[in-house]
């Protein structure tokens, strides 16, 4: 995982070394960027599974990552509990990022350009349409993620009240907030008491 992190950081520094010029994303560019972004991010996202050897097949690792980022919820893992704590967290975290949209997440943390990113946001965001909540798309993305983070935190707290262990509560909340359903137990919520099931409902 350390190798993947270092590679990603190095590439990030390379691309951020040159300040981008002001430009506007039109719908065509937004759709193309979204498609390319999904491919690149999915490849990088599957590397922790593959390099760690916990999912030895690159194809299976890529499938699991794409399923996470797209919040599909399909899995190639016969035994979810065979993954390490770190990999299970990453698996659920891909769901959390994908629940709001991978590129919306990037818009929230990275200034992609000085121009307008509304069409990039429209191409990536879930739902029928995206309006400007605030004048700048980066601020809109941040606002959406603040709300998203708040709802996730509330779920974690409620699960803790239901006597779920902290690690389980965090991973489960990441998986359910993105509406994908990735979990860390083979028998899902049957491992916990009834109050946990009611919390998720």
Where are the predicted features?
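Loop-to-transmembrane boundary segments
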Residues: 135-150
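Alpha-helical transmembrane segments of integral membrane proteins
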Residues: 3, 28, 32, 36, ...
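Transmembrane-helix bundle segments that line or gate the permeation/cavity pathway
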Residues: 40-81, 85-88, 92-122, 147-171
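N-terminal alpha-helical transmembrane segments of multi-pass membrane transport
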Residues: 1-60
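Juxtamembrane loop-helix boundary motifs flanking transmembrane segments in multi-pass membrane proteins
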Residues: 19, 23, 27, 54, ...
């Amino acid at each position: 995982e350390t190798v993947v992190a270092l590679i990603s950081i190095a590439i990030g520094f390379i691309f951020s070394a040159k300040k981008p010029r002001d430009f506007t994303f039109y719908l065509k560019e937004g759709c193309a960027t979204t498609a390319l972004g999904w491919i690149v991010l999915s490849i990088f996202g599957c590397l922790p599974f593959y390099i760690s050897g916990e999912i030895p097949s690159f194809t299976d690792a890529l499938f699991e990552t794409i399923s996470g980022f797209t919040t599909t919820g399909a899995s190639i893992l016969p035994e979810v509990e065979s993954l390490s704590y770190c990999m299970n967290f990453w698996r659920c975290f891909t769901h959390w990022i994908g629940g709001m949209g991978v590129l919306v997440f990037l818009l929230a943390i990275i200034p992609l350009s000085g121009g307008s990113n509304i069409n990039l946001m429209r191409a990536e965001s879930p739902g029928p349409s995206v309006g400007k909540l605030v004048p700048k798309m980066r601020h809109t993305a941040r606002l959406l993620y603040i709300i998203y983070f708040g709802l996730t935190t509330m779920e974690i707290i409620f699960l803790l009240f239901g006597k779920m262990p902290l690690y389980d509560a965090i991973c489960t909340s990441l998986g359910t907030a993105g509406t994908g359903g990735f979990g860390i137990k083979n028998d899902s919520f049957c491992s916990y008491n009834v109050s946990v099931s009611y919390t998720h409902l």
